[in-house]
Amino acid sequence: MTTDIVTSRINFYPYTVLPSAKPVYQYDLSIQVSTQGYNLDNADSYRALEKFCEQQDTALGNDPARSLFYSLIVDFPSSDSRPISSFYSQTDLGSRPVTHTVEFLSTQKPKRRGGRAGGMRGNRGGPSTTSVQALVKVTRVRQMDPLDLMSMKTLLNILLRRTFESSLGMLNIRSGFYDLNRTSTHNIQVDGRGFDICWIPGFRLTTATLYGKLGLQVLPETTKVRSKSMCELLNENRGSLHPNALAAITVMAMHNGRVFRIHSIVRGQSVVSPLAEGSDTDYFTYYSAKYKDKIDSAALSLLKQDDYCNSVLQRDKFILKLTPLKKTHNGKVVRSCNVPSSLCIIISDNEIAPYGVSKLSTNKTAVALSTMSPDALLEKATEFANQLIDNAELQSVLGDYGFRFTSQPLELDTFVCKPPKLMMDTLSRELTVEDDSGGVFRSLIQSPGVSSIYYANNGQPAVGMPHWALMVPRYLKNDYARRLKQELTQRIRSLAGATASTVEEPLLIAVDVNEQRRDMYRIEPYKDAFESLLVKLNTQYPDTKNSELISRIQLVVVVIPGPKQYSGGLYKEVKRFYTDKGIVTQCLLTPRLSRDGPEWYDQAILNGLCQQIYAKAGGAVWAPALPKDNAYSTSTMLCALDVSRPKKTVGRPTEVPASTAGFISTYEGSFEYIYSQKKNLMPNRLNQGGEVQQQTLMKTFIKNSCEVYSAFNSSLPDRIVIFRDGVSDGQISTVLETEINSLYEYLCQRYREANRPMCDLKVIVAQKTCAMRLAAVSNTDLRPGFYILNHSPDNKQKGSEFIMASQAIVHGTTPKPIRYKLIFDSTEASMDNSSFKQLIELTNTMAYGYVNWPQAISLPHILHMAHLLSKFCGEILGNGRDLLESQAIFGLQYRPFFI
C-alpha cells in the first residue's frame, strides 16, 4: 500500500507538565441579578467576580496585595453578550459552594425606546452607571488531572489567551512582543532591478494533541482575500470615499520572488488573461510589462520614506480583510483562499480603495499577501518558539502552572498512499492519475454508463437520457439555442461511451423572459416554459396523464439570466419548483452579450457542465478503484453524515435556525452510485446546533440504506464504514452514547434476522480544523496521500487516529491535512494491523471520487457530498418535506441532484 516512509517535521512544539506543578481547580460561576429587566453580560460578570473576590479576601484575611482575584484564570466566552461561567485557580476554595451578595456599577445603557413622547432618542448618552445587586455563587467542579490531555489543553489555551490578545478563538501575538526588525526586509527583483521591500511577520498560536503529547502550534496569520483583478482595482469607479477608506495600493502578491495576482493563485506558472490578449504568459512577465511604472514608483516612494517604514514596523500589525467572492473567469474557477500574512509586501501608492474596512485609518497602507512553503513556515515558527522561551514573563506564568515546552518542532515518520486508479469505461480499463497530468478530462474516453436502477417516479427502471429538456431565454436567439443543444448532446454522448445510443437530443423550450432588469429574475416564465414542455411531450404520448409525463423527464437544463449576484433568488426558485416535482435540474448562466451577440462559453465550463449533467442523470464519470487485495473493495457500504446550520435570521441574532442532516450511502462496488436522505432537526438547549443525532434518526438512515444495498446486491454488506463530520473532541463521547451504541444494537438484530454474522462496523470522525503543517526533513515536497499515525496512549478511550492530506502540492505549500479518528470499531483492530492500513487506503482513494474535480479533494467524496446535500436542502429547499417522507422527491434520492 505504501511506497516509502520519510521523516517529516511538523509545526508542533511539545509541552511537558513539570513534576512540581501545583494543583489547579476548575470552578463554576453562577450570578443571579436581582434587578428586573437586566441582562448580565461579559463585562458585568467580570465586575461581579471581582467584588466576590474582595469579600472572600476579607472573610479569609488575605493580603490585598495577593488578592484571590489576581490568581484567577478566567475562561471568557466567545461573545461579549454572554456572562462568564467558568474560571480556574490554584487556590482551593473547598468542596462546598461559596456564596456572597455583591453590588457593582454597570455601564450598560438602557434600551432606547425612541419615536414617541417620553422616549430617550434625545438622551444619547444615557446614565453613566447603574448600581446592580447580584448573588454570586462559586462551586468547585474538579481538580485538573495533569495526565488528562484535554484538561491540560483547555487550561493552556486559557493561559495563553490571558497572556496574548484573543481573536476568533485563536491567540494573536501582542504588539511589541516579537522583534520584527530581525526579519523585516526581503530583497525582490522587479524588472531586473532590486528593491528592499518591508515584510511583516505575523503569527498566531493554538494548541493541539499529537502522539500523546500536548503541543503548541505556531501558525501564520491568515485572512480571506477578495477576488478582484488588478485591472478592476486600478480602473474601478471609486465614487464617494468611505470615511475609513484605505490610502495606498498597487496590490501585488509575492511568492519566491515573483509577482502573483492575489485572487487567482492557481496551479502552474501560467495564466490566460484578456489583458494579455488571450495568450499564455507567466505572472511575473505579465505584471512586469503591464504595471512596470506603477511597481517602480510605488517601491521607490516607499524606500525613500525610511521613517515611514520604521513607524509601520513599530505599530500594531494590520491585515486587509475583504469579502471573499467566487466567480469563473476564462475557464478558471477563482476562489477566495486563506493566505498567510507572515510575508506581507507593503507597496505605497497615491490611489484610494474605498473598501469600507473598519478599524483602519486613512494613513495606513493596504497589504498584499502571499503563500509560504512549509519549510519557510517551520523556520520562522521555530525562531518564534525560541522567542517565546526567552520571554521571562511568559515562562513565569507557564512555570507557575507547571508547563514547559521545547522550541524544536516534532519529527515523525510519514507514510504515503499510492494514488488510486480510475475505472474509465465498461471494460474496467484502468488509467493512473498522475499529480501533474492536469486532470483526467483529457484522458476521459468512456465511463460505466447509466446503471439500471429504480429511480423513476413510476417505479420502472430508466436507462440513459431518453427524455430531457433545454430551456433557453428567447432573447438569446435561435442560433445560440441550437448550438448549445448540439454541443451538450455531443459531449454527453462522448461521456456515455457504450451507452451513447440511450442519450437522445433534448427538447428545446423557449422561455419568455422580460429583458428589463427588474422583471428578468422572476420564476413565472420558467413555470410557463415547463407547461410548454408538457405540451410537447403530450404530442409524443397522447392520452397520458401529466403525472406520467413528468415521471418520464430525466433532467432539465435551465439557462437563467446573469450575472450571478442578481440571479441567486431565481436559482433557488427554479430548484425548489423542479425538486418538488421530482425532476433533476442543471442551471447555467447566460453568456455575456456583446455587439456581435452572446459570447460563447469556455470549453472548460462546458466540460464541467456536462460532467454534472451526466452524473445527475445517473451516470458515473469515473470511479476510483481499490486494489483487489484490499478487503474493502468488495461487499462494503460507505456512509457519510453531515449537519449544516444556515445563517441566523436577519434581525433575530439570538434565534437558532433549524439544522439539516444529510446522509449519503453507497450500494454498488465502485462507490459512485449513491442513495441520499435528509432530515430537518430542531435545535434544543443541550444540542443547540443539532450536531448530535437522535437514536431513531440514525436507525432510520441505516435501515433505509441497508434495504437499498440489499435490493441491489441481494445481500447485506460485510463491512459498513460511516464517516462523520462536525464532531469535536468534546462531543465524541456523546455521539457514541447517543448514536453509535444504539445503531450497533440495531445492526446486530438486523443481521441475526438475516442469519448473517455481524458486519464489520467502523465509525470515523473527520475533523477539518486540523491546522498542522508538515515538511519533509530532506527538503523535498511531501507527495499527496501522505499520512501519519497518531500512536497515543489516550487513543484507548478516543479511538485510533491518523492525519492525512490527499490533495496535491500547490506552489510548494503542503495542503491542510484532515484528522481522522476511528471512534468505533467492532473488530477492535490495532493500528498496526493490515486492516487498519487498508482503511487508510480506502479513505485516500475516496478523495478521488468527486465528479466535479479531476484530482483529489480534501475529504472522501461521500462526506463532501453529504455536506452538499445538507447545505442544499437547508438553504435551497428550506424546511420542506424530508426525503424520507416525500414520494415526489424519492425519485431523486438515487442521483446527486445537489452537486
UniProtKB/Swiss-Prot annotation:
One BP term from GO: cell differentiation
Keyword entries, A-Z: Cytoplasm, Developmental protein, Differentiation, RNA-binding, RNA-mediated gene silencing, Translation regulation
Compartments reported by the entry: Cytoplasm
Signal sequence, renumbered to the chain: none
Extent of Gly residues compositional bias: 116-125
Pfam families assigned to the protein according to its UniProt record, in alphabetical order: Piwi (PF02171)
Highest taxon of source: Eukaryota
Record domain PAZ: where: 229-313
Gene Ontology, cellular component aspect: cytoplasm
Piwi domain location: 555-878
GO molecular function: RNA binding
SUPFAM superfamilies from the UniProt entry: Ribonuclease H-like
Region: Disordered, residue numbers: 107-129
Presence of the UniProt keyword Magnesium in the record: no
Disulfide-linked positions: none
Function: Plays an essential role in growth and, with Dicer, also involved in microRNA (miRNA)-mediated translational repression. The RNA interference pathway is implicated in antigenic variation having a role in regulation of variant-specific surface protein (VSP)-coding gene expression. Several VSP genes are transcribed but only transcripts encoding the VSP to be expressed accumulate. Antisense RNAs corresponding to the silenced VSP genes are detected.
Domain-level remarks: PAZ domain is absent, but Ago is capable of binding small RNAs in the same way as the other Argonaute proteins.
Subunit (UniProt): Interacts with miR2. Highly specific binding to the mRNA m7G-cap. May be a component of the RNA-induced silencing complex (RISC), a sequence-specific, multicomponent nuclease that destroys or silences messenger RNAs homologous to the silencing trigger.
Family (UniProt): Belongs to the argonaute family. Ago subfamily.
Protein's name according to its UniProt entry: Protein argonaute
Organism: Giardia intestinalis (strain ATCC 50581 / GS clone H7) (Giardia lamblia)
Organism phylogeny: Eukaryota, Metamonada, Diplomonadida, Hexamitidae, Giardiinae
Gene expressing this chain: Ago
